[in-house]
Amino acid sequence: MKHWCVWVWFTAGLFMACSSENQWLDTALNLAGDNRAELQKVLDRYKEEDGDKYRAACFLIENMPFHGAYEGKALENYRKYFSEYVSFPYSRHVQELIDSLKRADGEFSINQLTYKRDIMTVDSAFLVNHIEWAFKVWREQPWGKHVDFDTFCEYILPYRIGDEPLSLWRKEIYECYSPILDEFRKTDEADNPKVAAQLLMDTLRKANYRNTALFPVGPHLGPDVLKWHTGSCREFTDAMIYVLRALGIPCGVDRVMVLGDNNASHFWNFVLDKEGKTYIANLPYEEVWSKAEEYSISRGKMYRATYSIDKEAVRKLGKYSDVYPAFRCPFFRDVTALYTGSRNWTVALPDSLLSGQFREGDMVYLCLANRLQWQPIGYTFFKKREARFEDVGGGAVFTLAAWNGKEYAAVSSPFLLERETGKIRFIVPEAEKQELVLYRKCHLTLSVLFNDRMIGGVVEGSDRADFGWKDTLLLIKEAPYRLYTVARLKSDKPYRYMRYKGADGCFCNISELAFYENTEDTIPLYGEIIGTPGSFEDNTHEYLNAFDGNPDTSFDYIHPDGGWTGMDFGSPHRVEKVVYTPRNEVNFIYKGNLYELLSLIHI
């Protein structure tokens, strides 16, 4: 990976002196070496035959020096993680698969692979095939008339998504998914690519996806992501892109380098409607494409991946010998403003609020916290005695930093940029100690979904095993926010059977349930566990889990409605107290564990 970045930075340097598009193309052809003749064949073919195809070929070739793929024996070892996870038993943790592959093949590192540059290897037949298929779907689809040439080049034409092995993927994927749109093409909405994308996403969501971010870091997988459905957000976004681009729908991937409220980056898909507006989705979790400005992600800075390098950024950065690695290869555009809408802010700090000496034009980085350190997510140039960052999303804590080529140093105090107002509030240590009550180790993610699924759930008592008649003793009105929620029941009536019944659409998600005869009791009532058998996907999330004493296991009913879990006490008992735990990500505070609080001031 390091050698690739060096090559890209070196190559970018060759282009910095280019003042015209022809010079960019000539420089790319010169870098092709012995492969120049193959690329020239493509240009010669289209120069007289089709002006648009010639321009498209120029676009691909002039940016080709910055693209390539990895190869080597270790690549197959890496791909095993994804292919074997498809059939790996649900009852076993993914770490078991990882450990097994490490024992068999050794530790994987991307440094074990060899990087092959497209400019030196892509032949004319390959390039012509992709150009012909891209133009076919662009010109034949009813929505193609709303896709301009520049959008086509950037978000339909590219033959690759990232650094995956080269392949002729368009024809096979087109023939597989095109029939889904046959009836749609006859409708009045057939000119809207967003509606077509919705139909395709409906089909893609039917697959069984297995999400994990625990696999080693490696290259993109290529179109095999469509048959494996395993990996993280990167693999799932790639799958969507292959299908949409094969059908001539302009799309791609937007991302944040680091989330404002989590120690991770994130990728998601975007699609452009017939007016060029951005709609986004996270496959397979979201059912519909939504407007970009409605995305509730903690923003900071949002970037759109592109095949073409940002030529203007290359020219601006050319005079700087030390640029933070994430910005040396600018295959992206800043699209923050598309997401922030009216909450699009400017962060401007004068030199009086910065530590150190800055000269006119010095680079300054905007940073978010990531795993005990600050990570740059944007840059600007120090001008007129201030560091000014345009288009920033709020709702996160930032700092500014300088980079010397080896390490960076914070040059401002941390500050909160308020999402709604854009106001900057600096974070300074308080002189006095404060008391905090913490219920979780980090912010809610999936837990929001799981916690909310308990809203509308009920605790019921009955003297009939089938609950043919029952009394509702508790209605859960709010999402639980702690590991154990204690609810006191007001009924004096004894019951032989008691249960928790989940609300419709919630798969009866619950982790722990306990019934107590008296409010002061610490030992729950015991009996025969009863409930609706069957759990979603893997048969390891049965109703029995609600009474196993382990808050890390849970009940996930096979159907969204009608699930319940409970207990037959053998004889009627009064129950004054119920304790329950929502299905969770093991994110709660556990008694007996040792925790350490870290302040952003000291990161």
Feature names for model-found ranges:
Residues 16-17:
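C-terminal motif of bacterial Sec signal peptides marking the signal peptidase cleavage site
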Residues 360-379, 461-465, 469-470, 475, ...:
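Short amphipathic beta-strand segments in non-cytosolic proteins
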Residues 24-33, 46-48, 183-203, 212-223, ...:
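Hydrophobic/aromatic-rich core segments of domains that either
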Residues 343-356, 603:
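A short, amphipathic beta-strand motif
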Residues 431-471, 479-600:
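Aromatic, loop-rich ligand-recognition surfaces of beta-strand-rich domains
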Residues 405-431:
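Structured interaction patches on ligand/partner-binding surfaces of diverse proteins
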Residues 386-399, 403-406, 492:
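Short Pro-Gly-centered beta-turn/loop motif in secreted/extracellular proteins
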Residues 40-41, 49-228, 264:
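Secondary-structure boundary elements
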